[in-house]
Amino acid sequence: MTAFSKHRWRGPVIRRPKTTFGAFLLLFWTWWALLAVFRAFPGIDIYFSQLFFLGTDCDATAAAGSICGGFPYRDSGNFDLLRTIFFRLPYVVAIVMAWKLIECYQQHGATFNAERARKLKVGLGALLIGPVLLVNVILKEHWGRPRPVQTDIFGGALHFVEAGSLAGKCVSNCSFVSGEAASAGWLFCLLLFVPKSLRYALVPPVAAISILTPAMRLSFGAHYLSDVTLGWLSSLVVFAALLALTESQQHQKNSEI
C-alpha cells in the first residue's frame, strides 16, 4: 500500500447542526448570506424573471424605448386555480391545527399530551410570526420593492430595485418578500411533525406543493427569485427559532423536577 493510498483525500465534510439552536443559527445566517448575494448580483433576479417574460411589439401610444409584453402563465386559468388552492391550503391546515390544539387542552392529567400541544403551538406560532406578521405586515408593507410586472424592464412603470432595498416606489403589498412562498415554507416545516407511518404518503405531495407555490409566483411575474427564496426560507428560520426556544424551556423544566 502506497503512502498516497494511506492518506487519500476524502473531500470536505459537511456536518449537520447537532442542536435545534444550531439549526436555527445556520438557517438565520444562510438567509442573510443569500440576501447579500442577491443584493450584490441583482442580475440574478432579472435573469430568472426574463425566462418567463414574453415581449411583444408596443403600440403607437407607447413611449419611445418602452418595453411591452407580459408573463403568459399569469393569464392561465389552470395555473390560477392551482395557485388559489395552494394559497388557501396552509390556512386550512392551520384551522385544523387550532382545532386539534383545543382538543388537547380539553384533556387533563394523564390524558393530556403535552408534547403534541407543544408541537401544535410551535406550528401555529410560526405561521403567525413568520408569514403573517414578519412577511405580510412588516416586509411587504414597508420595503416598497415593485413586483416584476410593475417594473419598467417588464412592461411596468416603476424602476427595478434590488432585494432588500428601501428605495422602491411600491406603496402596498409589495414584492419583498413573497407571502405565499413563506406560507409554503411553513407547510414544509410541518413535515417534521408527521408520524413515521404517514411520511411516505404525505412528504412527496407536501414537498411538491411547497416548491411549486414559489415557482408559480416567479412564473407569474409576481415576485423575483430572491423574493420567493427568502420568503420560503424565512419560515424555516422562524420555525427553528420557536423549536429551539420551546426545547430549551422544556429542558429547564425537566432539570427543575
Swiss-Prot record:
It comes from the Bacteria. Gene3D superfamilies: Phosphatidic acid phosphatase type 2/haloperoxidase. SMART domains: acidPPc. One of its GO terms (molecular function) is hydrolase activity. The keyword Hydrolase applies. It is found in: Cell inner membrane. Keywords: Antibiotic resistance, Cell inner membrane, Cell membrane, Hydrolase, Lipid A biosynthesis, Lipid biosynthesis, Lipid metabolism, Lipopolysaccharide biosynthesis, Membrane, Transmembrane, Transmembrane helix. Its EC number is 3.1.-.-. GO terms for biological process: lipid A biosynthetic process; lipopolysaccharide biosynthetic process; response to antibiotic. Signal peptide: none annotated. Disruption phenotype: Lipid A contains a monophosphate group at position 4' instead of the usual galacturonic acid moiety. No longer has 4'-dephosphorylase activity on Kdo(2)-lipid IV(A). Increased sensitivity to the cationic antimicrobial peptide (CAMP) polymyxin B (PMB) but not to other several other antibiotics. A double lpxE-lpxF mutant contains lipid A bi-phosphorylated at positions 1- and 4'- and has greater sensitivity to PMB than either single mutant. No visible effect on free-living bacteria, or on nitrogen fixation upon nodulation of P.vulgaris. Pfam families: PAP2. It is a multi-pass membrane protein. The chain crosses the membrane at residues 21-41, 85-105, 119-139, 174-194, 201-221, 225-245. The keyword Cell cycle does not apply. Pathway: Bacterial outer membrane biogenesis; LPS lipid A biosynthesis. In this strain lipid A lacks phosphate groups, instead contains a galacturonic acid moiety at position-4' in place of the monophosphate group found in E.coli. Probably removes the 4'-phosphate moiety from lipid A species. Not seen to act on other membrane components, nor does it dephosphorylate the 1-phosphate group of lipid A and/or lipid A precursors. Belongs to the lipid A LpxF 4'-phosphatase family. This is Lipid A 4'-phosphatase. It comes from Rhizobium etli (strain ATCC 51251 / DSM 11541 / JCM 21823 / NBRC 15573 / CFN 42). The lineage of its organism: Bacteria, Pseudomonadati, Pseudomonadota, Alphaproteobacteria, Hyphomicrobiales.
